[in-house]
Amino acid sequence: MTSKKVIRLFGICVALLLFFVSAPQIHAQHAAAAATTTPISVYGAWACSNDACIWGTVRSVSEYDSQNHWLVDRGDGVPSVNLVVLSFVQPLKLLNKTNDAQTVNGVPIGMTQDIVNYFKSHNIRVMLSIGGITYASDWDQALATNPTQLGLNAAAVAQQMGVGIEIDYENSSSPNLTGLQAFIDAYRSQEPYDPTGANPAARLTIDLAAGDRWLIPLATKATTDWLTTSNPVLDYANAMVPSRQPSTSSAESNWQEHVDGKPQYSPPIPPLAPAKFTGSLYISDTKSGLPPECTTFTGSLINTTGSYVQSVAPNGAGTTSGMLGYMFWAAECPSSRGTCTTPPNSCTGGVGVGSSTYNIPVPMPPLRQS
């Protein structure tokens, strides 16, 4: 046998040895990766009615269903979502229990018990969102006036209607965090934190920016004091949509900022457990018609970010991998200028197919706590 043949044979033997040694390790790594994939729990939509989120008219259930049926039926009788957040309640009106042409006891007249029950009859959880960017100054005024009473009023509405409450306070520079703490304390005095999720009125959440570079004081306070896994005060946060629909990499980069925190900031923003927040995508309110996230699941961000959302690992907070899920902005007509999700349009092809693809549980199950 020539020396070249000996060398070649030796090389083959080494290659085979390396294959048999590394193959089990590779298999184990893939198995570990599969084991850390967590199913989506929260798959919800903000609902804006037909008047850019004012909810200023009373609507019959049949008329409302004719415009929004895709939410409760993705085509096979199963809802497209397991959460609907009726948006928005004006905080100052809620504090004052205002009654006017568009408001009753501080709540928009369109947010009726009939509409709430319409969703609940399909096992869809319902929440009311207080605030939004339009009402940021109203949040400021209400918190400066009587934040405790605002929290008590919010809890009373939640109890009466059987809904949860979402805090959407978008003061980016100088939020009244002392007032917001008093609001939360008052709410929790009536509705203590419920890890089981069985009590709808105990569900209290907050909206944060897409990443950690906007609403910085709010993110710092919320992540430090309200969204910890050791002493949770709020159930979870929604990482809101950015100014426009992101790319896959941009969306994941934004969400990763919450997971990593911002230790370089002063004060630092600590890491947020993946199990303590959702990521948000546009399904309407875009300039050029409805996006694929509404109409076409394949290739949409619901599709391309799915692996990340279900598997992102904790980085300093929490013990389980995967975010809670997705929120979608927004059903029906969030803007007077954009395209609505109403007939002949529908989001069954995007959100609905995503619901089926990810086997979204309806009703929403108890949420991971860490």
Regions found by a protein language model. Give the residues of each.
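Bacterial N-terminal signal peptides that target proteins for export
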Residues: T2-G11
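Short, solvent-exposed mixed-charge patches
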Residues: P366-S370
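Chitinase-like catalytic core of GlcNAc-active glycosidases
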Residues: A34-Y265, P271-T304, T320-M323, E332, ...
